[in-house]
From Swiss-Prot:
Organism in which the protein naturally occurs: Acetivibrio thermocellus (strain ATCC 27405 / DSM 1237 / JCM 9322 / NBRC 103400 / NCIMB 10682 / NRRL B-4536 / VPI 7372)
Molecular function GO terms recorded: transmembrane signaling receptor activity
PROSITE patterns named among the record's database cross-references: CHEMOTAXIS_TRANSDUC_2, HAMP
Keyword Membrane tagged: yes
Official protein name in the record: Putative sensory transducer protein
GO cellular component, one term: plasma membrane
Membrane topology: Single-pass membrane protein
GO term, biological process aspect, one: signal transduction
Broad class of the protein's primary localization: membrane
Localization per record: Cell membrane
Ranges of compositional bias, category Basic and acidic residues: 511-541
Modified residues (Glutamate methyl ester (Gln)): 268, 281
Length: 557
């Protein structure tokens, strides 16, 4: 710009006009760069220096404008004096300011680069520490959650063992509201149901047939069978009570039939023992499956928690990389501004060299200074270029790392979803296995009770055969046996006893003795298995009733 102001004094009007345009262009560019630099001020010292530079620039610009006006007015000598005095002095000062700015910003840029390297190193160290601490926390949480789950599971296992030994006075406390608490609540309801059914069986064993059996649902097989057994026993014992007077007349036929019933009951007892052993084996296998399913559920829950923790840490790493990327972009913009300033400084150095050449012998020292300024500007431009390339490479690698981290986060999300589904399935398997084990235990108890009933029937049959020779003693024994039971609707039972044996009963007993076949099981047309039960009808009080005549059923009579 100083070169252009000097040209105004030596060239013709056309060159003067072009010089004025060049001066205006330099003024606009300089003010644009000053405004751009002002937006990137890094500290208060830089801001104060910039304000001083702008004030000096305004003074320099006003002197240049004054020179232009003098040249336009034809006052060339006054313009020359102004150029050689005030404009040159302020120009030198302004050049010194620009050189100081270049040196200051170069130093600040180097310090900023070193600071960014230190921040990146610190961030890496912090990230490693955070990941290590997160792993320790995840392990601690896994151990803590495992203990929370294993304690109530252990209590339920202990209760199940006691229940398997026949102790119905066990209790399970549901202290939580999670899945374990729900499982404990279900286990508690199951124990209460078994305890209630055990109480019913105890009353039945004591001979109280007035007990009311409540069926929990359509799938409550044991409850329905207990109710059927109570109703059947009530019906059977009522019928026995009604036909007790006829037993004396049919003692001989009953004696023969009782021997056969005893043999059939013995065979049934043997079959039931084999069935009980098989059910116990199935029950043990089912309990083992339930235990394994519970352990798998715990492991799946721990894996799910670890995957979720890793996903959270990946999200934090993405945020940190995004911040590093933004900082690198800002530094890149600042380096570009420094590069532009170095370019302008180079131009100014060239102008200064031209001026020194024009000054001849007196401008040699100034030419040396201008050459050094130009070299410094070139070195600043090269350093800014290399720094820009490094920062751009860092940005690209950061973006690539961010992409990989996002893909890893998405994969972790899919892993969390898969583990959640697997945990749900394993939990369902565990619940189903526990329910199967409980159901098999109940069935095993029911079969044991049936076995006791069969053995009792066998003994009763033998006793009936031995006592059938004494008609009166048999009748009295039967009455005493019936008196042990408390039956429903005792007040409504007829007190009319048959003093003579019904001809229909006699024919029924004779037909049964002649046509009795060995017990066998066959598949009916409806797909169910039949045990060869025979039925007969009798007319009691004008009502027809079906009486089962198979080995097991007739033994109850």
């Amino acid at each position: 710009m100083r070169y252009n102001t000097a040209k105004l004094l030596v060239y013709d009007a056309e060159q003067v006009s072009k010089g004025i345009e060049k001066i205006q262009e330099h003024v606009e560019n300089t003010e644009k760069y000053l405004s751009l630099y002002e937006s990137t001020v890094i500290n208060e010292t830089d801001r104060i220096q910039l304000q001083e530079l702008k004030a000096l620039w305004e003074k320099y610009k006003s002197l240049v404008d004054k020179e232009v006006e003098l040249v336009k007015s034809g006052k060339t000598e006054e313009a020359r004096q102004l150029l050689l005095s005030d404009i040159d002095d302020i120009g030198d000062t302004l050049r010194d300011y620009f050189e100081a700015f270049v040196e200051y910003n170069t130093t600040a840029a180097k310090e900023k680069v070193d600071e960014n390297k230190q921040v990146a190193s610190t961030a890496s160290t912090v990230m490693i520490v955070v990941i290590f601490v997160g792993i320790l926390i995840a392990i601690a949480l896994g151990v803590f959650i495992s203990r929370i789950i294993s304690k109530p599971i252990g209590q339920m296992v202990e209760a199940a063992d006691r229940l398997a030994l026949g102790d119905v006075e066990v209790d399970v406390k549901a202290e939580t509201r999670d899945e374990i608490g729900k499982l404990a609540e279900s286990f508690k309801r199951m124990i209460e149901n078994i305890r209630e059914q055990a109480y019913v069986v105890e009353r039945i064993a004591a001979g109280d047939m007035t007990v009311d059996v409540r069926v929990k649902s359509d799938k409550d097989l044991l409850g329905k069978k207990l109710k059927e057994m109570v109703d059947t026993n009530n019906e059977v014992l009522s019928n026995i009570n009604e036909v007790a007077a006829q037993v004396a007349a049919g003692a001989k036929q009953v004696s023969d039939s009782s021997m056969q019933l005893s043999q059939g009951a013995t065979e049934q007892a043997s079959s039931i023992e084999e069935l009980t052993a098989s059910l116990e084996q199935v029950a043990n296998q089912t309990q083992l499956s339930a235990k394994n399913a519970n352990q798998a559920n715990e492991l799946a829950e721990v894996a799910k928690n670890n995957a979720e923790q890793g996903n959270k840490q990946m999200a934090e790493m993405l945020n940190a990389m995004e911040e590093i990327n933004n900082s690198s972009s800002n530094i890149s913009r600042i380096i570009k501004v420094i590069d532009e300033i170095a370019f302008q400084t180079n131009i100014l150095a060239l102008n200064a060299a031209v001026e020194a050449a024009r000054a001849g012998q007196h401008g040699k020292g100034f030419a040396v200074v201008a050459e050094e300024v130009r070299n410094l500007a070139a070195r600043s431009a090269n350093a800014a270029k290399e720094t820009t390339e490094l920062i751009e490479g860092t940005i690209k690698r950061t973006e690539n790392g961010t992409k990989i981290a996002r893909e890893t986060a998405e994969a972790l999300n899919k892993i969390v979803e898969g583990i959640s589904k697997a945990a749900t399935l394993v939990n369902d398997i565990a619940v189903a296995s526990n329910e199967q084990a409980a159901a098999i235990t109940q069935i095993n108890q029911g079969i044991a009770q049936v076995s006791q009933v069969v053995q009792t029937n066998s003994a009763t049959s033998e006793e009936s055969a031995a006592a059938s020779e004494e008609l009166s003693s048999q009748a009295e024994l039967l009455k005493r046996s019936i008196a042990k039971f408390k039956l429903k609707n005792m007040g409504k039972m007829t007190s009319n006893r048959y003093k003579e044996v019904s001809p229909e009963i006699m024919r029924m007993l004779e037909d049964y003795t002649e046509n009795k076949q060995p017990k066998s099981y066959s598949k009916e047309e409806n797909g169910e298995y039949s045990d060869g039960k025979e039925t007969a009808e009798k007319d009691v009080g004008g009502l027809k009733q079906k009486i089962l005549l198979s080995d097991s059923e007739f033994g109850k009579y």
